[in-house]
Amino acid sequence: MANKDQQDNDKYVTLTDEKGNESLYEILFTFHSDEYKKDYILFTPAGSDRITVEDPDQEVEIQAFSFDPTSGDSETDSDLYPIENDDEWNMVSEVLNTFVEDDSLRTDDKNDED
């Protein structure tokens, strides 16, 4: 079983842009699509507001990519690939909407303290 520090590290991913600038992002969730035979990761800038149904006008930057879970030790250690197909984007959007609307799919920080 992973220790608390390892679990915390697995909740974040660092992206490096073309200029070498690093940005920290919090992983919302990952999922696999049988239809596209790919795994996906969705994340938001670390420290940004939580996604809630109660505030429909809330704008939160969310990025989504596909990744190969076998290419690294975890999703935080694998290459990310852009989603370029509109149908694939629609599928990812549907999964995200389900995630936002279903409280049981999200974890709160208070649950992490156990």
Swiss-Prot record:
Domain of life: Bacteria
Pfam families: DUF1292 (PF06949)
InterPro entries in the record: UPF0473
Family membership noted in the UniProt record: Belongs to the UPF0473 family.
Name under which the protein is recorded: UPF0473 protein OEOE_1164
Organism: Oenococcus oeni (strain ATCC BAA-331 / PSU-1)
